[in-house]
Amino acid sequence: DDAKLEAPLAETWAPQLADAVKRAGASALLGTASSTGKDILPRAAALLGAGMASDITAVVAANKFKRPAYAGNAIEEVEIGGSVVVASVRQTAFPPSAGGAAGAVETVAVGAVDALGAELVALHATQKSARPDLGEAKVVVSGGRGMREGKNFKVLEELTDLLGGALGASRAAADAGMVPNELQVGQTGRVVAPQLYIAVAISGAIQHLAGMKGSKVIVAINKNPEEPIFQVADYGLVDTWEKAIPALIAEVKKLKG
């Protein structure tokens, strides 16, 4: 109930999680491989002196997991030693589990939050978004270098909001300053696996594909039919985004009434 812990920040949450694990005598600490989980869990693992497996896609044993490696081109098996296992789970890698009996919830007291954590909470409160987290969204619409400038992402934002999804971007678009870096999808950005991924004006560089090729359905829109993105797309449209996106927005609006 502490307001200072309302925002999921590593500086405030990691020490509290590590302390709770110690007091409970827990053998595992699990979380999602979202930007929040990837920020908090490694710090908690360090405070616990525990090993960690990130972005796991399968559980082999209590301390053994599978996770993607080499830009998603290989699957490696990792084993964590020690008495505590910390792991972040790729959300879309596991199907929903069958309902079971409700577990007991234990309420624990938390320690004091330092001044730095309190300041970061105040900053975080001004940066909330109405869209779902990029790593958890069922629909992701991403734009690439072909969008040319940041203001052109407005049309992608409109489509994104109509579909109830999250906005993403290629590294080229993020590096060019068109969008904030936290929207970057790829090997050095966010790894996503939504039900629907729409790639607009994205060439399909290997580092970008590593971050989205786990998507269930991939739609590519690009004016160049030779771009690599079409090799992984389930559906492709060869056209300019200036023509394709407004037309797609109009059709979605019709369907939504």
Functional labels for PLM-detected ranges:
Residues 1-257:
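N-terminal glycine-rich FAD/FM-binding segment characteristic of electron-transfer flavoproteins
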